[in-house]
Regions:
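Short, structured surface patches at the beginning of a domain
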Residues: 1-107
Length: 107
């Protein structure tokens, strides 16, 4: 990756609230472009429960670890991994991301 910033935007909500995905998508893109000043971004979205496989998230993580992104934006840190489900796993993912990129949250 050159010196240009590139942000991975991760947007995920439960199957019980898929309509929130659209609203949060607009909020995340606006925050990335206007507040962070990073117009170069890629959106990763999925709807699912905490127990499901997260194929899109796994693809994003692989690309973060290949240094494709300088920044990662999520609505809230628990979008990375549900802390109530496994706080150690959340910490592991956060550490893996922070080793390669800066994590930003809107909330």
């Amino acid at each position: 990756m050159a010196n240009e910033k590139r942000c991975a935007i991760y947007n995920r909500y439960s199957v019980n609230a898929p309509q929130i995905l659209d609203k949060k998508r607009d909020e995340l893109i606006s925050y990335c472009e206007n507040d962070l000043g990073i117009p170069n971004h890629e959106l990763f979205e999925e709807v699912g429960s905490v127990l499901e496989e997260r194929e899109v998230f796994d693809q994003m993580m692989a690309r973060i670890e290949q240094n494709e992104f300088s920044d990662v934006l999520v609505c809230h840190i628990d979008r990375i991994y549900k802390p109530g489900y496994d706080p150690e796993k959340l910490a592991e993912y956060v550490d893996r991301i922070r080793a390669k990129a800066v994590i930003h949250t809107v909330e």
